[in-house]
Regions:
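Cross-family detector of peptidyl-prolyl cis-trans isomerase
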Residues: 1-225
Length: 225
């Protein structure tokens, strides 16, 4: 069973001849990772397309269109980042840094309550490199705007407010955590975070380069019940 592939790869087919080969593969000796100890190779396979839709399917065209869509999304993200980069520059220049080094711009002043320490707050966020490149958001419209929309994430209900612990000991980058703790329910802010209060010299995988200054848009939508 491969549940990690659910919703990602869907292949439907039926073996019409050669069931004995499948039985042999199923009984092949396996290693500790449940893989055959010796490589099993398909030397020839014949796919029979039944039905009008199946016969009309053009794999080469679909393959080429996929990469065209990727290029369009990439261009969309680059253009959106350019606009946001200029906005970041103007805004940051007018803000005064807090003692830690972060700068906070109040976008919306909410009328909700101030969370108590150790409560879970529901948060919408969008994280950017300082050049305006979006690296992550749980807001569907933002990811669409920057060509980052993920259909799998959407199917898994990943575009919704995420619970974060409202406490100084939360496992968040320091700059994000400090900004979050200044907020009450309904507040929307934009916080400029120096790399030392972000992911520092290490960066984060291939998403955030080392020594990257970051910008986050943060909104507390509610307190988790």
């Amino acid at each position: 069973p491969t549940p990690h592939l659910d919703g990602r790869h869907a292949v439907f087919g039926e073996t019409v001849k050669g069931d004995e080969v499948i039985d042999i593969i199923a009984k092949a000796p396996r290693d500790e990772r449940n893989r055959p100890k010796k490589d099993i190779k398909i030397k020839k396979i014949t796919i029979i397309a039944n039905g009008k839709d199946a016969k009309a399917f053009n794999a080469v065209e679909v393959f080429n269109n996929y990469f065209k869509i990727i290029e369009v999304r990439k261009s969309k993200g680059i253009e959106a980042a350019k606009v946001l980069n200029e906005e970041f520059k103007k805004q940051e220049a007018e803000l005064k840094a807090l003692p830690s080094g972060i700068k906070i711009l109040s976008v919306v002043q909410g009328s909700g309550e101030k969370p108590q320490q150790n409560q879970l707050v529901l948060v919408n966020y969008a994280g950017y490199l300082e050049n305006g490149t979006l690296f992550d958001s749980n807001i569907k419209e933002v990811e669409e705007q920057f060509g980052k929309y993920n259909a799998l994430r959407d199917r898994q209900n990943g575009y919704k407010p995420i619970p974060f612990p409202y406490t100084p000991s939360a496992g968040l980058i320091p700059g994000f955590k400090e900004a979050l703790l200044t907020m009450k329910v309904g507040d929307k802010i934009r916080v400029f975070i120096p790399s030392s209060l972000g992911y520092g010299e290490a960066g984060a995988d291939d998403v955030i380069p080392p020594n990257s200054n970051l910008v986050f848009d943060i909104e507390i939508t509610d307190i988790a019940k």
